[in-house]
Amino acid sequence: MKRIHITLPRQVTVSVTAGLLCISALAGCRTSADEPGASASGSTATSETTSTQAPQADGAGGKNATSASADSKSAGGGSSQGAAGGDGATSAGSAGNVNQANADLQAPSTGNKRIGNYDVPKTNVAWVATDGKDSNDGTEAKPFATFQKALNTVKDGGTVVAKAGTYRPDPIDVTKKNITIQSAPGATVWIKGSEVVDKAKWKKQGSVWAATGNFHNFCTVCTVNQDPKQEGMAAYPEQAFINGKALRQVASKAEVKEGTFYVEDKTPTTLKDPKNNGKGFNVGKQDAITYYVGSDPTNATAEVSRNARAITVSAEGFNLKGINVAQYSPVQSWKLQNDPVFKDKAGAVAVFIAGSKSTVVDSTFTQVSSGGALGFSDSHGSRAANNRFVDNGGGAAGANRSDDVVYEGNYFSNNNTAKFRIHDCFAYCTIADIKVTHTNRTVFRGNVVDYSAAPREASKASERTTTFPAFWCDEGCIDAKTVNNFFTNVGTAIFYEVSSGGVIASNVVEGSNTGVSVGGTDKVKVYNNTVSRTYRPIYVYEDARYDGCNSREKNSEKCVFPEEWSTNHHLSWNTTGVEIYNNILSSRASNGPKDATNVPLAMPVYLDGAKNTNGKEIYSNQMFAGFDYNVYYRSNQSNEPIVMNWDLPSKDPQKDGPMDVKFSKATDISKDSNAGKAVKGIETHALDTFGSRAHNPYFAKEAESNSAYNQSNYNLKEGSKARGSGKPLPEDVAKAIDPTGKKVAPGKAVDRGALVNVKMDSAKK
């Protein structure tokens, strides 16, 4: 059965002055004829929440710290809550709780490295503290209360130093160049988008507690999906916490019970067209809102949503160091530009950086609902390193129209806790741990995406429709480098879609649904990846769209909705010139022989050609420039009879072709007359063997269970045939894997499988 590619119109809107990153939460816009939407292909997903410790609620502090009351005028007020519809209408709620095992709240870090001891300049510096006053002089001894006062005081190149504590600031605007906001030496600093509700405000009503106040009127119809009801409760950005633990939002007061909450707004924001938020909004009033909770808030610290945006940066050279961000509630899209309080800053990301050469390091982003946590837009040469993105309601991070951005050493886990739709959402599928669009030379290196605590096994065939991409490069990623990353129990580890060029190398994927997926992308090099116990290790397909056009007139070549970035960069959106070398595909998570014949089709390498709408055929013979030196390790021939298919066009020009040729042995491919001789190698140097996981002849140790996450050592064992037998690396691949050139050099025979990885020995603590 052939993959059906559904295309909807798309339009890109980017405006830094208006605070627009794109219409979707973090990156990538695909639209219908009336309104921008989200990215139209590929990802399918839901997320799971683990019940663990959240950021500590703090009831004390300064003016902009944790002392904000439920009636705080500066917070705005009102939250829109109406009846929800669609699947999962009561399944979502506040962003998830921070997984204590994944995020040490005292010293957030992705490794053992001590963070938070940053040098403090002697001049052009201002201090803030939770017990500070804006009437002070901003010295360490007499700190300010608010970040904005400190920022207004320093000049270009200045530094704001935050003392330890929990702050609840109004949205912070950075307009000066080369500004740094950092934690004080050794200090743990949180900025939170929630407010503490005074215990006296809670009134018992039967089995629930109610608090009425000037809470913010959040838009609950501001989704990427034009019909918000299809997103169910995920469309509702409000959050509530008891002692830092997130409560789950429900659609009515009658549904409130222990661990849940409901928000009542009598004048909510509504749609001019109930099924199309692109037609505009009837903006709700800023009046009394009532939160109903099912957990006793009177002997605890109760927090509810207050702010959507934490920080907006419009100047270059910004640095954020050791500042943890939690409990912000941006709506998912940028469509609402006249929020009663936030105006054009109600969406769609908590920390929005539109300044080049910026850095975000050593920070935790958690419990950000609906919209994304960190977004770069028109932010060239920027870097995010050693951060944690955990338990966020939607996608965690993203970049749009931002060249030379580097993500390195970050940790991602348990995002999309709001459970946005990720299957059958077509143009509105946007959820990923990180999504990048319209960029040149993005680097995603040495990051960890770990869903080992999730209560599902992504490697099961059935999870194909319930899991989403970890790293998604979509719609005009040019020459991205995705290297040395570790993925466990994820949906699709690496999704490279309608883009061009790039290197996907030395990544390790274990216990997942799909390892590497390449579609509608030319000249990408897939080298030296290790994929273990994964349902579909490598998937390469042709996208029916072409030449940067998302939608054409029926029976016509006329492009109705061109994607401007891709057309300007002359991207073909055809899967051609792909190179696949030196990968180890081991111990596929198999359901038996039926995987090769039943939908969804799966085998170590699955190829899916297609005919473009202009009639051009892109099948296996057109897809590849080279394909060789890969390693296939299967349980046995009867359980896993097919190693790869070679997809060919149908002999009937009126029909899309079936999967014509299946190979039981990798070395048979080059001998088959159907395989195009223009493709170099065609596995003449492949290693294709059988055996148990316990006796894997390649790895030092491969865990035996699909769900035995972080228990394998993917270093090659002594005497392994994969040692030193791989194809020599091109210079760009070698440099992407090891920029220093100390461990990996071009032009020399290399090991097969991952060469350098952040968790080569995943069992090592």
Residue ranges of predicted features:
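C-terminal motif of bacterial Sec signal peptides marking the signal peptidase cleavage site
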Residues: A25-G28
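Glycine- and acidic/polar-rich repeat regions and solenoidal domains
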Residues: P171, R309, P330-I353, S370-G381, ...
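Bacterial N-terminal signal peptides that target proteins for export
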Residues: R3-V16
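Extracellular polysaccharide-degrading/modifying enzymes targeting complex plant/algal/animal polysaccharides
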Residues: G93-G355, K558, N574, F627, ...
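Post-signal peptide N-terminal segment of mature Sec-exported envelope proteins
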Residues: G37-N97, A101-A103
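Hydrophobic helical h-region of N-terminal Sec-dependent signal peptides
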Residues: T17-C22
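Bacterial signal peptide processing site
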Residues: R30-S32
